[in-house]
């Protein structure tokens, strides 16, 4: 499965200082790309899904699926910024 990243997602990921968190998030994304395994995820709103990483503050990656073969990573965050991250994800998706 092809996984694409928005500039907003890349900016968020690059700012993560916790190397273990980066590794865990990268591993989750890699499993989607190579094994079509999504792990702990759920729909949140309007075609946007939340991938939950159970580490640290509860990292979240918001994504949408286009067809059966493309996943677009919209933005990331954690449990404390969940609502604002969902709103940002909606805006990013609207502009894609």
Model-derived regions, located:
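Solvent-exposed, charged helical/coil patches
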Residues: 2-30
């Amino acid at each position: 499965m092809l996984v694409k990243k928005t500039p907003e997602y890349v900016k968020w990921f690059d700012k993560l200082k916790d190397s273990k968190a980066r590794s865990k998030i990268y591993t989750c994304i890699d499993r989607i790309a190579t094994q079509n395994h999504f792990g702990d995820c759920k729909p949140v709103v309007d075609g946007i899904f939340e991938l939950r990483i159970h580490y640290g503050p509860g990292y979240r990656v918001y994504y949408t699926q286009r067809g059966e073969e493309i996943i677009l990573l919209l933005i990331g965050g954690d449990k404390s910024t969940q609502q604002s991250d969902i709103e940002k994800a909606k805006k990013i998706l609207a502009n894609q």
